[in-house]
Amino acid sequence: INHGLHRIHVVDLDGAKASSPQNLDTLRTLAAVEGVEIEWGGGIKTEQALADVFAAGASYAVVGSVAAQRPERFEAWLQKYGADRMVLGADVKQGRVSVNGWQEEVDLTIDQLIDRFLPYGLSQVICTDVSRDGMLQGPATDLYVRLQKKYPTVDITVSGGISCMDDIISLQSLGLRKVIVGKAIYEGRIALKDLQVNELTRGQVNG
């Protein structure tokens, strides 16, 4: 917050494994910090789980596996809770969407997944290139640029591979609007003060 970052992306890994949110107390603690918006994902498989996440203070809910495997459920959530609060989480592996912690692939491309929900107002997508996540080898730039050009009304958030400020500056110059930065911060490759002055990352950091 001291560096101007107000949107924190958090993945409940325990929740993803258990198929239901497991760290709501942590969410409540984070959400209680003034000036912070929490973007929370992991284990949101039912409407009760979604309601619990919002009740615990999340500003945004990231839904991945359900959107790919039970699309009618995600459509209903977009309509009930609003596209401004619902984020489509799409993990991509070799061109196909992966679900359930990257353990399974479904017969869908990222484009098909986005197309399914556009009529319901979808406006936020976090796309993670599984092969690059946590590798610090640079993002799959071509993928993100193509998606952002194809879907100008959707904010395509870059996730995976960010290794340095040059990666972020390059993405910004190519028209990308949002990026999640995690491991590069933890390992000291990117300083929070540098993110503060960059428009692409202002307001969003991975937690």
Task: Name each model-derived stretch.
Residues 8, 53, 88, 125, ...:
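Conserved, mostly hydrophobic/aromatic
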Residues 1, 45-51, 106-116:
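Short, acidic/polar
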Residues 1-11, 119-121, 125:
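Catalytic domains of carbohydrate-active enzymes, especially glycoside hydrolases
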Residues 26, 33-34, 38-60, 142-178:
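Catalytic cores of alpha/beta
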Residues 7-26, 127-137:
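Glycine-rich, proline-tolerant flexible connector loops at the mouths of alpha/beta enzymes
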Residues 72-81, 172-207:
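C-terminal helical cap(s) of enzyme catalytic domains, especially alpha/beta-barrels
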Residues 21-28, 103-112, 137-146:
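Charged helix-capping and loop-helix junction motifs
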Residues 58-133:
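Conserved anion-binding
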